[in-house]
From Swiss-Prot:
Similarity field: Belongs to the CCM2 family.
Entry keyword Cytoplasm: yes
Phosphothreonine modifications at: 394, 399
Stated name of the protein: Cerebral cavernous malformations 2 protein
Role this protein plays: Component of the CCM signaling pathway which is a crucial regulator of heart and vessel formation and integrity. May act through the stabilization of endothelial cell junctions. May function as a scaffold protein for MAP2K3-MAP3K3 signaling. Seems to play a major role in the modulation of MAP3K3-dependent p38 activation induced by hyperosmotic shock.
Disease: Cerebral cavernous malformations 2: A form of cerebral cavernous malformations, a congenital vascular anomaly of the central nervous system that can result in hemorrhagic stroke, seizures, recurrent headaches, and focal neurologic deficits. The lesions are characterized by grossly enlarged blood vessels consisting of a single layer of endothelium and without any intervening neural tissue, ranging in diameter from a few millimeters to several centimeters. CCM2 inheritance is autosomal dominant.
Keywords: Cytoplasm, Developmental protein, Disease variant, Phosphoprotein
The keyword DNA-binding appears for this protein: no
């Protein structure tokens, strides 16, 4: 009977109901495939570390990278240590248990990260609806954390009270976390921050993204600092009016700006992997305390040195040369003219300009220093400015840090960034204006 039943079934005959069902399945699969193939090519570059992107590309254009967007955790304590793999994964695990972050990633989580010197923008890969936009100055740190096969890139950003609930995933379950498990104890009101959780397809892709963000921080800092230096020195040296000590007012407002990053790509490369259960599991990070420096202190240190080494007329010549360089003169011409101004006995003064040379000219500047025999370890400038390079080279971890997170309750009561910036420029300009008068008085 079984053999007759088998013989009775004619091969190739499909039930009409199955035919309709299979046709619908094939149609959906075809549409899904077409949806994927219709994705536009990204506006991107491919980096082979330690290769770097031209700074002009970040200033005047943008770069896109494909990532997976897990979500955004809000109301995270601001003192969260971005270098602690354990702390970061604790918040992520709590959010997954509360179904605030997806446990498994699918094609629906595909997103496009658009990066420029002004902001980081996230949009869905299909449809390209904007998920969120984070200004560069709101990014405190970027960490790469490997969790089993997942390569996570975590952005620690300022808390944004205006963000919509659909774009933000509030880590309510994380609020019950004891302070003892965090890197610092909470005393009094705690600043809140956000964690934007992304996933890259591989370790290389995650490192590349961190490298790009590191270059953005460097470009933004360098452009702002050299423009400030140009205005402060040129305006002050050209019209000396009164005398002030460079360190006469310790209470003057100082705005902390991130120190220029090490030009070598090793600062932003992440040569080691982080494995779960390893001997020393950690996320790759450089703490903010190791990278942060005051632009005011850098300028004051350098101008104090120039005050002891240059005459009033030479300082005005230095200001004019810097102004010409900022208005289109080549870095080679700038270096040659400064070399002539300083002479052999004062050529070590060129070392102090390192933090203020744009990235695009930094390699030529370093080559010029080597050509004229100026190296680290010679002269007083190395002690004042060379320490920044040494501090970076001795750093043991590697997350790229940007400006500190903003948006806390303290910030609302303090003067705006624009007011503090203008006041800092005024203070430094006044100090520099006094250089000529001060040296004339000393010589008299």
């Amino acid at each position: 009977m079984e053999e007759e039943g088998k013989k009775g079934k004619k091969p190739g005959i499909v039930s009409p109901f199955k035919r309709v069902f299979l046709k619908g399945e094939k149609s959906r699969d075809k549409k899904a495939h077409e949806k994927v193939t219709e994705r536009r090519p990204l506006h991107t570059v491919v980096l082979s570390l330690p290769e770097r992107v031209e700074p002009d590309r970040l200033l005047s254009d943008y770069i896109e990278k494909e990532v997976k967007y897990l979500g955004q955790l809000t109301s995270i304590p601001g003192y969260l240590n971005p270098s602690s793999r354990t702390e970061i994964l604790h918040f992520i695990d709590n959010a997954k248990r509360a179904h605030q972050l997806p446990g498994h990633l699918t094609q629906e989580h595909d997103a496009v990260l658009s990066l420029s010197a002004y902001n980081v923008k996230l949009a869905w890969r299909d449809g390209e609806d904007i998920i969120l936009r984070v200004p560069i100055h709101d990014i405190a740190a970027v960490s790469y954390v490997r969790d089993d096969a997942a390569h996570l890139v975590v952005l620690k950003t300022a808390q944004d009270p205006g963000i919509s609930p659909s774009q933000s995933l509030c880590a309510e379950s994380s609020r019950g976390l004891s302070a003892g498990s965090l890197s610092e104890s909470a005393v009094g009101p705690v600043e809140a921050c956000c964690l934007v959780i992304l996933a890259a397809e591989s370790k290389v892709a995650a490192e590349e993204l961190c490298c790009l963000l590191g270059q953005v921080f460097q470009v933004v800092y360098t452009e702002s600092t050299i423009d400030f230096l140009d205005r402060a020195i040129f305006d002050g040296a050209s019209t000396p009016t009164h005398h002030l000590s460079l360190h006469s007012d310790d209470s003057s407002t100082k705005v902390d700006i991130k120190e220029t990053y090490e030009v070598e790509a090793s600062t932003f490369c992440f040569p080691e992997s982080v494995d779960v259960g390893g001997a020393s599991p950690h996320s790759k990070t450089i703490s903010e305390s190791e990278l942060s420096a005051s632009a005011t202190e850098l300028l004051q240190d350098y101008m104090l040195t120039l005050r002891t080494k240059l005459s009033s007329q030479e300082i005005q010549q230095f200001a004019a040369l810097l102004h010409e360089y900022r208005n289109g003169a080549s870095i080679h011409e700038f270096c040659i003219n400064l070399r002539q101004l300083y002479g052999d006995s004062r050529k070590f003064l060129l070392l102090g300009l390192r933090p203020f040379i744009p990235e695009k000219d930094s390699q030529h500047f370093e080559n010029f220093l080597e050509t004229i025999g100026v190296k680290d370890g010679r002269g007083i400038i190395t002690d004042s400015f060379g320490r920044h390079r040494r501090a970076l080279s001795t750093t043991s971890s590697s997350t790229t840090n940007g400006n500190r997170a903003t948006g806390s309750s303290d910030d609302r009561s303090a003067p705006s960034e624009g007011d503090e910036w203008d006041r800092m420029i005024s203070d430094i300009s006044s100090d520099i204006e006094a250089l000529g008068c001060s040296m004339d008085q000393d010589s008299a």
